[in-house]
Amino acid sequence: MDCVKLVFLMLYTFLCQLALSSSLPHLCPEDQALSLLQFKNMFTINPNASDYCYDIRTYVDIQSYPRTLSWNKSTSCCSWDGVHCDETTGQVIALDLRCSQLQGKFHSNSSLFQLSNLKRLDLSFNNFTGSLISPKFGEFSNLTHLDLSHSSFTGLIPSEICHLSKLHVLRICDQYGLSLVPYNFELLLKNLTQLRELNLESVNISSTIPSNFSSHLTTLQLSGTELHGILPERVFHLSNLQSLHLSVNPQLTVRFPTTKWNSSASLMTLYVDSVNIADRIPKSFSHLTSLHELYMGRCNLSGPIPKPLWNLTNIVFLHLGDNHLEGPISHFTIFEKLKRLSLVNNNFDGGLEFLSFNTQLERLDLSSNSLTGPIPSNISGLQNLECLYLSSNHLNGSIPSWIFSLPSLVELDLSNNTFSGKIQEFKSKTLSAVTLKQNKLKGRIPNSLLNQKNLQLLLLSHNNISGHISSAICNLKTLILLDLGSNNLEGTIPQCVVERNEYLSHLDLSKNRLSGTINTTFSVGNILRVISLHGNKLTGKVPRSMINCKYLTLLDLGNNMLNDTFPNWLGYLFQLKILSLRSNKLHGPIKSSGNTNLFMGLQILDLSSNGFSGNLPERILGNLQTMKEIDESTGFPEYISDPYDIYYNYLTTISTKGQDYDSVRILDSNMIINLSKNRFEGHIPSIIGDLVGLRTLNLSHNVLEGHIPASFQNLSVLESLDLSSNKISGEIPQQLASLTFLEVLNLSHNHLVGCIPKGKQFDSFGNTSYQGNDGLRGFPLSKLCGGEDQVTTPAELDQEEEEEDSPMISWQGVLVGYGCGLVIGLSVIYIMWSTQYPAWFSRMDLKLEHIITTKMKKHKKRY
C-alpha cells in the first residue's frame, strides 16, 4: 500500500512539474542571445533607412520603428521584439526585422548565421548600404520564408540560395543593383519545388523563362527583370496561381492561351504592362471571373476596348494607360465595382457622364485623352474619390463645386484644359497635390489651400489668378513644389515663404507683377533646386543668403529691376547649371577670385541687357568645365534632369540663333553664353575656344575690339555666333569655315577687313551677316577677293544685254566700216593695176572683204 502511495506521489509531482514547465516561457540559449546582440551592434539606427515601408503583398503602408532597441541581456531573447522561439526547445526559429531602421554593412561572417534553426527570416526595408548577399544564407536549411527585399543589397544573388529546398516564400527584390545569372535562375526554379511565392522584382536576370515552375505557386513576381523570349504557356495553367506580375519586360513576348486557363478560377491579379502582347486579347480572357486587378498599360493596344475585357465585371483595379485605345468613355459604366481606373494617354473621347454610375471610385486617371465639354455638375456619389486626374484634355467650363466638396480628396490635377471661373474653397483637409496650371482660372488663391498640413505640390501657373500672395502660404510647411508663375499676382514676396519650409525644392513666381526686394532669407540646409522669379518688378540686390542654396540648379532673376554688381559668390553653388540675370540694372566690372571651381557646372550663362563694363570675365569663362566637353550621345534627346519634371517644367527665356524664346525644357547639350547688350570692352579672350561644347555665343552690342580669336575654330558644335555691333577689326579667321554646325552668323557693324571665308556654312550666309564692315570682300558681297573670278552683278548683265541687243548702233558701225573699207579697197585696186602690186596682197584683201561681208549677213539674220 505504501508503494502504491509512493508511486502516486511521484506521478503527481511529475505531472505538476510538467504542467508548471509548460506554462513558463523557455529561456533562449545564451549563445543565441549573444549572437543576436552582436548582430544588433553591427548596425546603427537611422529612421531614413526605412523611410518608406509597405506590405509587399497588399501595398499597405507600414510604420517603421527600431525593433532592436528593446534587445538587452536582462531579458530572454524570446521576449525581444521581432524574435520568435520554439515553444518546446527555446531555439530561435523566426526573426522579423522588417522596417527596423537598421543601417550599416551586412558582413558575410555575421553572427546571424549562427542561428541555424531559423525557419523564417525577414530583413526587408532596411539599409545595408550596398552589401553583398552572403552565400551563408544557403546554410539555413530549415528556412521556409526568406525576405531580403528593399534593403540595399547589391551584386549577384549567390547560387547557394538554390539549396533552400524547403522555401515556401522567397522575396529578393531591390532596385539597388541585384542580378541573378540565368543558370542559377533555372536551378532555383528546379530545386525550390515547394515555393508558393517567388518575388524577384527588379533583379537583373536577362534570361528566357524556364517552364519548370513549382505547381504550388500562388504568386509569381518577375517585373523589371530584363526577361526576353516567349513566356511559356504553362505559367497560365498553374492551377493555384493567384498573382502574376511580369510588367516592364519590353523584350518579353506574352501570348495568352486561346483555350480556358487552368488558373482562370484562381487568378486575381495580372500585371503585364510594358511587355510585348502578341496577337489580340483572346476570348479565353472572358473566363477570368476572379480577376480583380488588370494592368495592361503600354502594350501597344489599339482600337476599341477588346471585347473579352467587358466580361470582367468583378474588376476593381483597371489600368489600360499609354496605349492607342479609342471610343467613348461612357462604356465604362459596366464596371460597377471599379475603385481605380487609369486610361491615361489614349484616344478616348466624349463626356464624363459615366461618373454618376461608378460610385466606388477612389482613383481616376483620364489624363491625355480627347475628352470634351464641361465636367457634369450633378454628381454626388463619389465620396470615396481620393485622386482625380483629368489633365491635357479639351474640357471647359467652370470646375463644379462637387470636386471642391470631396471629403477625402488627396490629389487633383485638372491642368492643360480651358477651365474658367474661380477656385473655390476645398473641403478636404488631406490634400497633398493640387495642379490647376494652364487654364483660364481667375480670382484669388483660396484660404483652404493655404491651410493644408500635408500639401506637397501647388501648381497654379498660367492662369489669371490675381491679388497678393498671402503670408498664410508660409503655413504650407510640407510644400515641395510651389509654382504660381504667369499670373497677375502683385505685391511683395512673403519673407517667410522659404524660411519656414525646409522641404521646398522649386519656387516659381515668374511673370507676375511682384515688386519690392527679395527679402527672403535662404537658410542653411535648404534643398531648393529651382528659383525662378523672372519677369517681375523686383528691385534691390541679389540676396547674399542664396549662397546657402547648395542644391540649386536653376536661378532665373531676369527681366526685373535689380540694381547690383555681379554676384560672384554664386559661383560657389556647384550644382548650378542655369544662371540668368538678363535685363536688369546690374553694373560694373565682373570680378572673380582665383578659385578655378567657380561656375564650373554652368551650361547656360545669360547676363545680357545690363550695364556690365570692363573686360570680359576671362577667369569665369575659363572655369566653365561643363562647356569644355562635347555631348556625343546619340538617340533620344536628353534634357537637364529634375526629379520633379513629371509635375513641373521650368520656363526660362533662352536667347539663341538670333531669337529669344521661352524654353519649357532645356536640352542637356544646350550650352549658351549670352553677354550681349552691355558695355564690355577690350579683346575677346581666346580661352573661349576651349569651350568646345558651346552651342550659342552672343557677345553683340558691346565695345569689344581686337581680332576674332582663331581658337574659335575649336567650337565644332557651335550653332550660333553673334559678334555684331562692336569694334572688332582684322580679318575673319579662315579656319572658321570648318564650323559645319553653324546656322546663324552675325558679324555686322564692326571694322572687319579682308576676304570672307569660303565653306559649306559660310556660303549660306547673306549680306546682313557682314553689313557695316566696309573692308570686307568676297561672297556674298559685291567686292571681290584677289584671285577670284569676276563676279558679274545684275546691273552689269543688264548693260551687256542692252549693248548686245541695240541694232541701231551695231548697223551704223558696220556701214561706216564698210564704206571706209570700200574706198580703201578701190584705191588699192587702182594702185595694183597701175603698179602691178604682188598677187599675195590681192588675195589678202579679198579675204578681208569676205570676212566683213559674212559678218554683215549674220547680223541681218539675227534681226
From Swiss-Prot:
LRR repeat ranges, renumbered to this chain? 92-115, 116-139, 141-164, 165-191, 192-214, 215-238, 241-263, 265-287, 288-312, 314-335, 336-358, 359-382, 383-406, 408-428, 429-452, 454-476, 477-500, 502-524, 525-549, 551-572, 573-597, 599-623, 667-690, 691-714, 715-739, 741-759
**Gene Ontology CC, one term:** plasma membrane
* One GO term (biological process): response to molecule of fungal origin
InterPro entries on file: Leu-rich_rpt, Leu-rich_rpt_typical-subtyp, LRR_dom_sf, LRR_N_plant-typ, RLP23-like
Q: Which family does it belong to?
A: Belongs to the RLP family.
- According to the record, glycans are attached at 48, 72, 109, 127, 142, 191, 204, 212, 262, 300, 311, 378, 396, 416, 464, 519, 563, 698, 714, 746, 767
Quote the annotated effect of residue 722 to N. Answer: Abolishes resistance to C.fulvum
Q: Which cysteines are joined by disulfide bonds?
A: none
What subcellular compartments does it reside in? Cell membrane
List residues in topological domain: Extracellular.
Answer: 22-812
Changing residue 365 to N: what effect?
A: Abolishes resistance to C.fulvum
Record gene name: CF-9
Report the domain of life of the source organism: Eukaryota
Q: Transmembrane residues, as ranges?
A: 813-833
Region N-cap, as annotated, extends over 24-91
List the stretches on the Cytoplasmic face of the membrane: 834-863
How does the record comment on the protein's domains?
Answer: The extracellular leucine-rich repeats are required for the specificity of the elicitor protein recognition. Important sequence determinants of Cf-9 function are located in LRRs 10 to 18.
Report what the protein is called.
Receptor-like protein Cf-9
- Described function: Involved in plant defense. Confers resistance to the fungal pathogen C.fulvum through recognition of the AVR9 elicitor protein.
Q: Where is this region: C-cap/acidic domain?
A: 760-812
- What does the UniProt record report as the effect of altering residue 457 to F in this chain? Abolishes resistance to C.fulvum
Q: What is the effect of changing residue 85 to A?
A: Severely reduces resistance to C.fulvum
Residues making up the signal peptide according to the UniProt record: 1-21
Look up what happens after changing residue 835 to D: Severely reduces resistance to C.fulvum
- Chain positions of site Not glycosylated: 674
